[in-house]
Structure formats: structure tokens, C-alpha cells
């Protein structure tokens, strides 16, 4: 299970936004729709997801109708606040959204589009496990307005998939990608590196397999051991080795080199795309501080500097909405200093970087030291921007600390 919700102020039961919220209708608006169901809990995962035995009476078949109730609430709240505007991006995440019938995903998307509108050329992404994507599923999603499928490949090596508790076979990824392509969908694949027992050769095999798929976008994430997960307990008991930082660094450098050679450009520390048009616009909205409403249990939202998050369990979420109450559990409104620090954290991960002028004034002189250490690109700094080098990407957290402490 994921950890406790963040601290914050109580959220209004009717979901209303503060009257003094500085709404800017020019800021792009996105929607995140959380589908919290999984057949099996992966040993490394601490996301807010639930297997069938953990639902405590919540019914998967009722979920679409329940989430649409929150969409109706959001339409009223945003309309009252003068913040209603079309969605630039929509993202179905999880969990495993494709465990729901594709018709349910289509209903939720249609409800959101009816409530808020959908911008011309909007990006609509659905996350999927490879073994849940069939030609029929892909065609139904495409017909509903989905434009992009993000497929959880993670690895092409069977023993690595086993270490991660993934249920699909490597060959299922090709089947899923082909189904998505035949339906006219753009394709992104997710990889994880640094799993217990994974060698550099294993990782290279996964990169080769991912590149052979001819996808539009590849994400590669270092395995992080989260407290409370099965994998964390296995490491603590000495059953599996802890990931090696040095090996993970070697894996990242290999990924960057192989992806660049294949025509992919990095645009965020863990993300590469074949072209600017294939970047994840939804994730860029998060990193650039746009507005979004997160629907579903445990989902987080952000509008004009206000943040809130929903109750975590699907049963509690459904009970709140059945009582005509907002499912929000808490809210917070960070001050200007906190928002500046978060901006540094997020924008510094992007290839476009962050303007030196947007750093805390007392820390701007530190950029010279980061250049000398090979962490920040000197040419970008001349243009007034902080842009990470390859070494800087490997040590991104340390760079952020230097720029914000």
C-alpha cells in the first residue's frame, strides 16, 4: 500500500474552491483519471492500487459510474469558480486502466469531454499492461478518442520480469504494440532498470527489444525501493540484493546512448521521444505547473496554486460521492517560497531547463560551481538557463539541493 496522505487542511465537503484563487484561463487544463485496480500487486509498487481481495465491498463494475459522479462535481465547482476550460490532455493511469472494459473507459472520457470540452488535437493517453491489450480493446479506445497507449513493458528478460512480479510474457509486448499501431494509436513503452539480479547485458537486451518495437516514446525509470513494499521486505530479509547505484548509473548512461543513437531525444530525465510531437504533453503539464483535476481514489489535483487529494480507498471514495460529498481528503496552498522551490525541482529535470532568473536569488551564484563540476551545461547558462548535463541528470537530486538549500 502507498504511504499516508500528506498533511494539509480539511477539504470542503462540497469541493468548492476559495473565492480568492487567482484563476488564469490561459493556463492549460488537464484531467487525470485514476483506475486503482490490479490483478496482482507488483513487489516494487507503492501506488494506490488494489487487488480484488482488497476492495472491501467496492465493485469494479460500478467504478466508471462512480468516477463520472466526481466529474459532474468538478464541472459545477470549476464553473462556479470561473475556471472551466477545455482539457488539453487526459491521462488514464493506475493501477491497470485496461482491466476495465474499454467501454467503461470510453464512458468516462465522454463524460469528461462533455463536462469540460476537449481541445482540438488533445492528447488522450491510457496506461496498459501488455497482456490486457487486444485488437478489439485498441480499436474501441481509438474510436472513443484515445490517441496514445502507454504500455508497461518494464523488461524483455523473463527473470527480470519475475523479479518485478510482472505477469506478462516478453512476446506480449509486441502483440500489444501491433494492436495499438493497427488502431492508429501512438505508442509509448515504460522500462524499469536496476531490478534484483538484472545485469547490464540484461538491460541492453531490454533496450534492444524496446527499440525494435519502433515506438514513439520510451520512459526508463530506475527501480526505487519503497518502504512497505514486498521488495523492500525481501531486501531487508536478505532474500534479494539491493540495487547498486553504480550499476543503475551505468544502465542510465547506456540507455541514453542507445536511445540517442536510435533518434530519440531526452526531454526529461527519465523520458525520451522521437520528436517534439511525441513527448508526453500530459506529464509536461505536471512539470510546468499547469492546472489539472485528478479523479479517482487517492488522485491529486492542482488549480491555480491550490492542491488537494482524494481519499485513498475505492470504498471510501464511492461512499463520499454517494452521499453527494466531495471525495477530497485534504487541501493545501503552498506559499510563494514553497512554490518557487517546487518549480526548481520540476523544471530542472527538463531538457529546456529553468531560467537562472527563476532560481532563489541567493542561490543563483551557485550555478558557476555546478558548471565547474560538470553538472550544468555551460552554453545553456550563457543563455540564462540551467540545463543538466548527462552527469547532472545522474545527480539531479544533488543539483536541486544545491539550487534550493
Language-model features: where?
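C-terminal scaffold of the Radical SAM
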Residues: 18-30, 48-358
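Local cysteine-cluster metal-coordination motifs and their immediate loop/turn environment
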Residues: 34-49
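An alpha-helix initiation/capping motif
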Residues: 249, 360-361, 390-393
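Flexible, acidic/Gly-rich N-terminal and inter-domain linker regions that tether
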Residues: 1-32, 39, 378
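A short, conserved structural fragment
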Residues: 371-383
Amino acid at each position: 500500500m502507498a504511504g499516508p496522505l500528506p498533511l494539509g487542511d480539511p477539504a470542503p465537503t462540497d469541493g468548492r474552491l476559495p473565492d480568492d484563487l487567482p484563476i488564469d484561463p490561459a493556463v492549460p487544463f488537464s484531467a487525470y483519471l485514476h483506475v486503482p485496480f490490479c490483478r496482482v500487486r507488483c513487489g516494487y509498487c507503492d501506488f494506490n492500487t488494489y487487488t480484488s481481495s482488497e476492495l472491501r465491498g467496492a465493485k469494479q463494475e460500478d467504478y466508471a459510474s462512480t468516477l463520472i459522479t466526481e466529474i459532474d462535481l468538478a464541472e459545477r465547482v470549476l464553473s462556479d469558480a470561473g475556471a472551466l476550460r477545455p482539457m488539453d490532455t487526459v491521462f488514464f493511469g493506475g493501477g491497470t486502466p485496461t482491466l476495465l472494459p474499454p467501454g467503461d473507459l470510453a464512458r468516462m472520457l465522454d463524460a469528461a469531454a462533455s463536462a469540460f470540452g476537449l481541445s482540438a488535437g488533445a492528447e488522450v493517453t491510457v496506461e496498459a499492461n501488455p497482456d490486457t491489450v487486444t485488437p478489439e480493446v485498441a480499436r474501441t479506445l481509438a474510436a472513443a478518442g484515445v490517441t496514445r497507449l502507454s504500455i508497461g513493458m518494464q523488461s524483455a528478460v523473463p527473470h527480470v520480469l519475475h523479479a518485478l512480479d510482472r505477469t506478462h510474457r516478453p512476446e506480449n509486448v509486441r502483440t500489444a504494440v501491433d494492436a495499438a499501431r493497427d488502431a492508429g494509436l501512438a505508442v509509448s513503452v515504460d522500462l524499469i532498470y536496476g531490478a534484483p539480479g538484472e545485469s547490464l547485458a540484461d538491460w541492453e537486451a531490454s533496450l534492444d527489444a524496446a527499440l525494435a518495437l519502433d515506438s514513439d516514446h520510451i520512459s526508463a525509470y530506475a527501480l526505487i525501493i519503497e518502504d512497505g513494499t514486498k521488495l523492500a521486505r525481501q531486501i531487508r530479509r536478505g532474500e534479494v540484493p539491493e540495487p547498486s547505484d553504480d550499476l543503475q548509473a551505468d544502465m542510465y548512461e547506456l540507455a541514453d546512448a542507445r536511445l540517442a543513437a536510435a533518434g530519440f531525444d531526452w526531454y526529461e530525465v527519465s523520458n525520451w521521444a522521437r520528436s517534439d510531437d511525441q513527448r508526453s504533453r500530459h506529464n509536461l503539464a505536471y512539470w510546468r505547473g499547469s492546472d489539472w483535476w485528478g479523479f479517482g481514489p487517492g488522485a491529486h489535483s492542482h488549480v491555480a496554486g491550490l492542491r488537494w487529494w482524494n481519499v485513498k480507498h475505492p470504498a471510501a471514495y464511492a461512499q463520499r460521492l454517494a452521499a453527494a460529498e466531495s471525495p477530497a481528503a485534504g487541501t493545501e496552498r503552498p506559499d510563494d517560497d514553497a512554490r518557487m522551490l517546487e518549480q526548481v525541482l520540476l523544471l530542472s529535470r527538463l531538457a529546456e531547463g529553468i531560467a537562472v532568473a527563476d532560481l532563489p536569488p541567493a542561490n543563483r551564484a551557485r550555478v558557476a560551481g555546478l558548471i565547474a563540476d560538470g553538472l550544468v551545461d555551460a552554453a545553456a547558462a550563457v543563455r540564462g538557463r540551467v540545463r543538466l548535463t548527462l552527469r547532472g541528470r545522474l545527480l539531479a537530486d544533488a543539483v536541486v539541493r544545491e539550487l534550493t538549500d
